[in-house]
Amino acid sequence: MSISAAGVATGLGANVELKSNVGSSSSSVAGVRLFTSRKAQLRRCAAPATSASLYSDANYDLNNYKFAPIKESIVAREMTRRYMTDMITHADTDVVVVGAGSAGLSCAYELSKNPNVKVAIVEQSVSPGGGAWLGGQLFSAMIVRKPAHRFLDEIEVPYEEMENYVVIKHAALFTSTIMSKLLARPNVKLFNAVAAEDLIIRGDRVSGVVTNWALVAQNHNTQSCMDPNVMEAKVVVSSCGHDGPFGATGVKRLRSIGMIESVPGMKCLDMNAAEDAIVKHTREVVPGMIVTGMEVAEIDGSPRMGPTFGAMMISGQKAAHLALRALGLPNEVDGNYKPNVHPELVLASTDDMTASA
């Protein structure tokens, strides 16, 4: 039986196995021994109960409801063992996606279709999703311009169709749907409440990220020493959004160390120009680092797009295929991608993929 780093049995094709010996009290991941009290077992969820069976079953007597007993230490061990296992597994990973907004989530979702690609998502907020929980000015609806609605069809998000765009009744419907589908995949791990403080640079190549708890990253000036951790990666996808406390941090760091010349910042709003430009210029800005989403507008000085989200989804998809190309795998950019994709999806031009330093 193959068990993912999260301790969930996954069947064939899992990248990392938690190997357990029958009768043994220890396991190992990537050569590191881990404690486990018993052999893990896969149990499928029971079929959803109807309202009639819910109230007729004695186990669901809401006036006398009883939970199975548990020791508090078991809860602590289960959480800690799985999280530490995930950290060990992703200390050296294939792709790190920095930022779990709509572009970062779309990128990770597209990457996760290849079960042999390990994906770690680093998000400084406790709640992933970036600005995609609401539309503009804290309104509920999300606007997606065609033809990006085909991505919504793929992940099965319902919408109201207009002539040139579609409307999702609440932005949270998109974000919750893509997260639930993405995080169920065994080759993906989301590290939320974790900040990318810096980059790992070897020569002229980005080779990973420097990480820390987000609360620590925001409070270095209050303590004497709170050193970070690291994640090595073959590819880093920076989807840190537009300017802000954690905004555009990837390209800002590249500028500060002289790997790119400038980060002019996004221009004033122009929806029609902005979305096309963001998808077109999603690219590998330096070897090992791909920029996607609104961070593209920050590095290029292109217009901001405001409360329309199609470019975030397609820019994220394009970033994923650029990452696959960097890994030497089939991808849509090179036209050799075989899995189940929409034939109507035509990625924007990929000329000049690497910006000059």
From Swiss-Prot:
SUPFAM superfamilies: FAD/NAD(P)-binding domain (SSF51905)
Highest taxon of source: Eukaryota
Residue positions binding substrate: A103, E123, Q124, G131, A196, D227, H242, M294, R304, M305, G306
Protein localization: Plastid, Chloroplast
GO biological process: thiamine biosynthetic process; thiazole biosynthetic process
Cofactor note: Binds 1 Fe cation per subunit.
EC number: 2.4.2.60
Catalytic activity: [ADP-thiazole synthase]-L-cysteine + glycine + NAD(+) = [ADP-thiazole synthase]-dehydroalanine + ADP-5-ethyl-4-methylthiazole-2-carboxylate + nicotinamide + 3 H2O + 2 H(+)
Enzyme class: transferase
GO molecular function, a single term: cysteine-dependent adenosine diphosphate thiazole synthase activity
Modified residues (2,3-didehydroalanine (Cys)): C225
First and last residues of the transit peptide: 1-51
Gene3D superfamilies: 6.10.250.2840, FAD/NAD(P)-binding domain
Protein function: Involved in biosynthesis of the thiamine precursor thiazole. Catalyzes the conversion of NAD and glycine to adenosine diphosphate 5-(2-hydroxyethyl)-4-methylthiazole-2-carboxylic acid (ADT), an adenylated thiazole intermediate. The reaction includes an iron-dependent sulfide transfer from a conserved cysteine residue of the protein to a thiazole intermediate. The enzyme can only undergo a single turnover, which suggests it is a suicide enzyme. May have additional roles in adaptation to various stress conditions and in DNA damage tolerance.
Family: Belongs to the THI4 family.
Assembly notes: Homooctamer.
Protein known as: Thiamine thiazole synthase 3, chloroplastic
Natural source organism: Physcomitrium patens
Gene: THI1-3
